[in-house]
Amino acid sequence: MARTRRLQSDPLIFFSALGFILVFVVATLAFGDRARQTYADISGWLMDHFTWLYVGGVSATLIFLIVVFVSRYGNLRLGDDDDEPEYSYPVWFAMLFAAGMGATLLFWGAAEPLNHAYNPPRGGYDSMSREAIIQAFQFTYYHFGIHMWVIFTLPGLAVGYFVYKRKMPARMSSMFSPLLGGKVYDTPGKLLDALGIIGTVFGLAVSVGLGVLQISAGMNILWDVPLVTPVQIGIICAITLAASISVATGLDKGVKILSNLNIAGTILLMIFVLLTGPTLKLLGQITESFGIYAQSLPELMFWVDSYNDNPGWHATWTAFYWAWTICWSPFVGMFFARISRGRTVREFIGGTLLLPTTFDLIWFSIFGRAAIDMEEKDPGVLTTPVVEEGDTPQALFTLLAEYPLYAVTGTLALVVIVFYFVTSMDSAALVVDMFASGEENKSPTFYRVGW
């Protein structure tokens, strides 16, 4: 049925998604502060009333995926029974990581543990006390651990099954075919695909915005480039141009190569801080991270602050993270499925949950503990600009500036951040084009570049 109804780029999908995005942008520009306040009010209401749903829903998804992982369905292959994986494990992981986490890791690596240690989320602990620091790592590991990756894995698994096992079009709506039946090819399915495009664009906009702020901060600290809007617009244009070139070269030449460079640069930064920083403390934090995470996860995965001990905290942190990640999930899930054809369901779940989580724990242990150690030795060196003044984008570069060879490591960090965002935009363009066309590789190059 799916093969006989090959879907091409659809006007309803394209124009409904593009129209909504344009109306949103025009309204934001036209009404300025009023529009921003309206968006903030809507977001605040959703967070206040549905934090329980975000937290409980993501945790329920994790339990579901664990059940699938250990069941007989774990042996199913995403594709024909004789399909082989297209990418090796290292390349596969690099591409998974670049699409799912990317520069977010560099943005929050030093900043989030420092924020929570300075302003403990709960428990009445003194700022920067031992208890506050332990709790800071508990929440950081929770936010960037298995739960974040669960949000990507579920749609990726569903799309991978229906597209590669059931031979349906490469669209987000395909995973809703059990609910929609034949209507998946009609207006309901097309509107779901348009929603996937909108979510991808909005999720990417948040990430690119954070990335531009961090790149701008790094250039300011490294080369004294002024923190002004024209510079930031120039950064956006440069990244967009680079992403356009990358997407034109295709998945194997663009995303694959950049992903490998990204993960190599990330590991180099991690090793550098580990060896030149308080090595024994960092090794101890890495070792303890797995125990801290395993011990705190069963409680935190269902904690919603129902007694209102810290009003608004979830809306700023956990619920915001999950909402933001859900916006990303159609794109990242589809991309995960695209590069995982030929792998079993068990391989897919294990690879998209366990490997990235392990890497995240190590990264945050190194950069978070290094930042806290620096703050303990020189109070205010990081908390004043990053926490009190809210200049989170400079956290990584302020940290690296206190280490030797900053001209080298700071430049490397900038290059890695830029490459991560080029990879994200490249991958998003490929996936959005698939949502609109239902095909993996048949659209003209200028379609993908246009997206």
Predicted regions and their residues:
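Extracellular/periplasmic helix-exit of transmembrane alpha-helices
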Residues: 108-123, 273-296, 357-391
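Flexible loop linkers connecting adjacent transmembrane helices
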Residues: 2-5, 37-43, 70-89, 114-138, ...
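Membrane-water interface regions at transmembrane-helix termini and the short interhelical loops
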Residues: 2-6, 31-46, 66-86, 136-143, ...
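N-terminal alpha-helical transmembrane segments of multi-pass membrane transport
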Residues: 1-132, 248, 271
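Loop-to-transmembrane helix boundary motifs in multi-pass membrane proteins
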Residues: 6-21, 181-190, 225-244, 248, ...
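Helix-loop-helix module between adjacent transmembrane segments
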Residues: 5-8, 12-15, 19-29, 62-67, ...
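Transmembrane-helix boundary/entry motifs in multi-pass membrane transporters
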Residues: 3-11, 47-51, 81-99, 136-146, ...
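Helix-loop-helix connectors at the membrane interface of multi-pass transporters/channels
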Residues: 1-5, 171-186, 211-234, 266-272, ...
